[in-house]
Swiss-Prot record:
This is PKHD-type hydroxylase AZC_3753. HAMAP family: Hydroxyl_YbiX. Keywords: Dioxygenase, Iron, Metal-binding, Oxidoreductase, Vitamin C. Signal peptide: none annotated. It comes from Azorhizobium caulinodans (strain ATCC 43989 / DSM 5975 / JCM 20966 / LMG 6465 / NBRC 14845 / NCIMB 13405 / ORS 571). GO terms for molecular function: 2-oxoglutarate-dependent dioxygenase activity; iron ion binding; L-ascorbic acid binding.
Amino acid sequence: MMIHIPKVLTPEQVARCRAVMDAAGWVDGRSTAGAQAVHVKKNLQLPDGSAEARELGEMVRAALQRSALFTSAVLPRRILPPMFNRYDAGMTFGSHVDNAIRFVRDSGEPLRTDVSTTLFLSEPDEYEGGELVVEDTYGAHKVKLPAGDAIVYPATSLHHVTPITRGSRVASFFWTQSLIRDAGQRALLFDMDMAIMRLNQDHPGHISAVQLTGVYHNLLRQWAEV
């Protein structure tokens, strides 16, 4: 299940991210790649743990906590500190699957990567190429969103970034360990949550909405890992 999360960051926050990144030093993105991804990854990243990455990462995490849609789609338990990358002309990231386990930067604590997120920080007309392509049983899905918007998708997905042919593309990317390990169960809960919200809008206080909310929370209680 891929979910588009619009307007995670405001235009002012995007501008702040761009200003910080424009003044920052970048390193080879292969420094954080896994054993297979290192052979197909060609991009730049803000140094993990740098002052710039920490400032922008806190901004992103605070914005995510305010996003009801992100919470409903992902049901986050723990979010790995956001990272930031840049693709210039000729850069790309070939097909790969994200590592199942990553480690929190400061504590070294392991985190299971259930959900991947890309938060776009460049406008689509600033670059050509650079689409995120996520593959599932229904085919390949190209994603290129306005600055400040995010896409979330199961971290089990095969995906790649097409080569940049003009301009530069900057983004934040990170992983979340969900309360719900199984992507199918997350999708069912998300669909139910959306249906409950629509029912509440159309028929405020209706007993069916109350009953469905109870079913939602009982399923969450049954499936959640806390």
